[in-house]
Amino acid sequence: MKRLALALKQKKVASWKLEEVKELTELIKNSNTILIGSLEGFPADKLHEIRKKLRGKAIIKVTKNTLFKIAAKNAGISTEKLEQYLTGPNVFIFTKDNPFLTNMFFENYKLRRYAMPGDKAEEEVIIPAGDTGMPAGPILSVFGKLKVQTKVQDGKVHVVKDTVVAKPGDVIPTEALPILQKLGIMPVYVKLKIKVAYHEGLVIPAENLKLNLEGYRSNIAEAYRNAFTLAVEIAYPVPDVLKFTINKIFKNAITLASEIGYLTPESAQAVISKAVAKAYALATAISGKVDLGVKLPSAQQTQTQQSTAEEKKEEKKEEEKKGPSEEEIGSGLASLFG
């Protein structure tokens, strides 16, 4: 630091630069994460809004790239891997927070600004009905070009009805720009573009900072569903699984009881139904040779009954395969996603 001060003194560097480097050095030392954002195309006057939002969470500094590099060196950080990002006007964000969550804030936080020539509309740009506060005069012809119906009342221009002057994707008409400004309409969204993050020695480019939360949620839900199905199959002894496991075991026991004719209050209906079905099948097989003196169901009825029984079996199998419902998965993930 003494060498730097001496070198700067010899070159007659302004004292504010010395103070700036000193402040930046302390910020770098006391921050877990540093994000570098581009100020190209971003209104500098909008930074105060971001500062207010991040107050207590991050410190935002606009400084020269050369001063940042000197400060980083003083703090014991090599800027070799950051060189490609230290071009053009930049803003530096110093924080102790996670770089991914901090970047997500900038991804989602959009600010409005007035439209400039060549800007495209992201949503419908509407001139609303009512008093514009503009005196009648040449401005009427501008409204006419934009096909905005007007009337003059008390010497002021009034818009008759809400009028769309640009749809999403359209270039906002140049004629509309001064009118939109006078009406205080800011139709263009801007956000601070993060170039890179430096976190505890790691350099993380912007493309690697983006979080696909919906994708993560879907993957976790799928993993939970698969784990739950496996847990039911192996009868893993936890409360959420056991209610499904016990139900499955009970169904399997009833099926086995009906096959071997084991009679209990719970299996009685299944055992008797199975016995009746076998009796009818046997009676049908010998009815052509022996007069049994009973009326047997037709082949079609028997087939229908068998089909119905098979469908019920299939439904049971499907229910077992499905495992937990979406609601149950949701409650299971509640602790993860709040």
UniProtKB/Swiss-Prot annotation:
GO MF assignments: large ribosomal subunit rRNA binding; structural constituent of ribosome
InterPro entries xrefs: Ribosomal_protein_uL10 (IPR050323), Ribosomal_uL10 (IPR001790), Ribosomal_uL10-like_insert (IPR040637), Ribosomal_uL10-like_insert_sf (IPR043164), Ribosomal_uL10-like_sf (IPR043141), Ribosomal_uL10_arc (IPR022909)
Region annotation Disordered: where it falls in the sequence: 297-338
Subunit (UniProt): Part of the 50S ribosomal subunit. Forms part of the ribosomal stalk which helps the ribosome interact with GTP-bound translation factors. Forms a heptameric L10(L12)2(L12)2(L12)2 complex, where L10 forms an elongated spine to which the L12 dimers bind in a sequential fashion.
GO biological process, one term: ribosomal large subunit assembly
Keyword RNA-binding recorded: yes
Name by which UniProt lists this protein: Large ribosomal subunit protein uL10
Keywords recorded for this protein, A-Z: Ribonucleoprotein, Ribosomal protein, RNA-binding, rRNA-binding
Family: Belongs to the universal ribosomal protein uL10 family.
Pfam families on file: Ribosomal_L10, RL10P_insert
Free-text function comment from the UniProt entry: Forms part of the ribosomal stalk, playing a central role in the interaction of the ribosome with GTP-bound translation factors.
GO CC annotation: cytosolic large ribosomal subunit
Composition bias type Low complexity, residue spans: 298-308
Biased composition (Basic and acidic residues): 309-325
Keyword set includes Ribonucleoprotein: yes
NCBIfam families: PRK04019.1-1 (NF003095)
